[in-house]
């Protein structure tokens, strides 16, 4: 077990997938946990599985909704020490097929929502003079990838947002970091790579020989909020099993992208 402060945690986008795994990991470590999501049904199911959780339905693309959610979470949790932003949406389309509606909707969730949640929660976290913010980003915003320009642009924007806050938040002893995974077993991966053949081809590109799992992200998130992670600040941590390093040959076979 990490030497964790077990202070209250708010996870935005935690009703399913990666966010849910993060919430369950923090619960296991003894934290007071609140989860926010737009998915009312997912929140209801999560609450049935973990009655000790606090849940709040919110639309992160709405500043008013975020304000109300953060205020309620701060009050009912007894404070917010750590914010984890795991909300996100994607759709894989060629650039010429991405219309303005999809562009705006994706940035509203992935970038504006992040800004809103930090804007609303930072006063509470900074007042404590300790705490952290962890953003679940995307490694493909570093490496680039075909299809989904609106998604990668929004995730790259999150990098800039994080870096711009390093000095200001650090002055209040609040740390901010981004976890940048690439291929993680999730609903989002199933959307982008719907067949087992595609998933196997993808796995062949990863030096460690497997796809990432939600618990890989949950464990790193826990570390970043722990005492052991207290000197990590302003970092983009690429979590991809070595995929970004793609050698020309692997075990006698040519590695194709």
Predicted feature locations:
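Active-site helix of classical SDR
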Residues: 118, 154, 162
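Substrate-binding pocket helix/loop in short-chain dehydrogenase/reductase
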Residues: 94-95, 102-107, 202
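Canonical Rossmann dinucleotide-binding motif of NAD(H)/NADP(H)-dependent dehydrogenases/reductases
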Residues: 2-33
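Alpha-helical segment proximal to the catalytic Tyr-Lys
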Residues: 123, 167-171, 230
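The beta1-alpha1 cofactor-binding region of Rossmann-like NAD(H)/NADP(H)-dependent oxidoreductases
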Residues: 58-68, 100, 215-216
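Residue(s) in the substrate-gating loop at a strand-loop-helix junction
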Residues: 138
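Short C-terminal tail/terminal secondary-structure segment
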Residues: 222, 233-257
């Amino acid at each position: 077990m990490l030497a964790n402060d077990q202070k209250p945690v708010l996870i935005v986008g935690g009703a399913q997938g990666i966010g849910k795994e993060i919430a369950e990991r923090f619960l296991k470590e003894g934290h007071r946990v609140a989860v926010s999501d737009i998915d009312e049904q997912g929140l209801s199911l999560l609450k049935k599985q973990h009655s000790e959780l606090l849940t709040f339905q919110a639309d992160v693309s709405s500043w008013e909704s975020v304000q109300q959610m953060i205020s309620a979470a701060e009050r009912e949790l007894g404070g917010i020490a750590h914010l984890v932003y795991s909300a996100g949406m994607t759709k894989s389309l060629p650039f010429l097929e991405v219309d303005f509606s999809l562009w705006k909707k994706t940035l509203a969730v992935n970038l504006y929502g992040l800004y809103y949640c930090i804007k609303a929660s930072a006063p509470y976290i900074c007042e404590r003079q300790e705490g952290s913010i962890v953003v679940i980003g995307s490694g493909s915003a570093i490496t680039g990838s075909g299809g989904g320009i609106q998604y990668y642009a929004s995730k790259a924007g999150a990098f800039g947002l994080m870096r711009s806050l390093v000095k200001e938040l650090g002055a209040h002893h609040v740390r901010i970091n981004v976890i940048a995974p690439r291929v993680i077993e999730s609903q989002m991966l199933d959307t982008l790579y719907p067949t087992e053949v595609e998933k196997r081809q993808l796995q062949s590109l990863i030096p460690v020989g497997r796809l990432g799992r939600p618990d890989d992200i949950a464990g790193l998130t826990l570390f970043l909020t722990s005492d052991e992670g207290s000197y990590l600040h302003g970092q983009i941590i690429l979590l991809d099993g070595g995929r970004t390093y793609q050698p020309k040959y692997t075990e006698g076979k040519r590695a194709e992208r």
